[in-house]
């Protein structure tokens, strides 16, 4: 696992879904402890777009990977 995600990323559900739908996403990170419905929505869309998904154990850990001081449910590395 990487220590930090690259700078060209978006964090959060709305921005992640937007990036995937606009075909700007390269890779998707999802926290395993994110709300079930949210988790499934992002996972399904990422699979539909044939994107690589990386599962992170906790939202706190994903927040740290994103270099933010709060928890994050999803993040997308942009092309």
UniProtKB/Swiss-Prot annotation:
It comes from Clostridium acetobutylicum (strain ATCC 824 / DSM 792 / JCM 1419 / IAM 19013 / LMG 5710 / NBRC 13948 / NRRL B-527 / VKM B-1787 / 2291 / W). Keywords: RNA-binding. Belongs to the eukaryotic ribosomal protein eL8 family. The keyword Nucleotide-binding does not apply. Gene3D superfamilies: 3.30.1330.30. This is RNA-binding protein CA_C3141. The keyword RNA-binding applies. One of its GO terms (molecular function) is RNA binding.
């Amino acid at each position: 696992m990487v220590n930090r995600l690259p700078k060209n990323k978006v964090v959060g559900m709305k921005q992640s879904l937007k990036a995937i739908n606009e075909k700007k996403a390269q890779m998707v990170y999802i926290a395993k402890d994110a709300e079930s419905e949210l988790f499934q929505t992002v996972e399904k869309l990422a699979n539909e777009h044939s994107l690589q998904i990386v599962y992170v154990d906790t939202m706190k850990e994903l927040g740290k990977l994103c270099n933010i001081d709060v928890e994050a449910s999803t993040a997308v590395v942009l092309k």
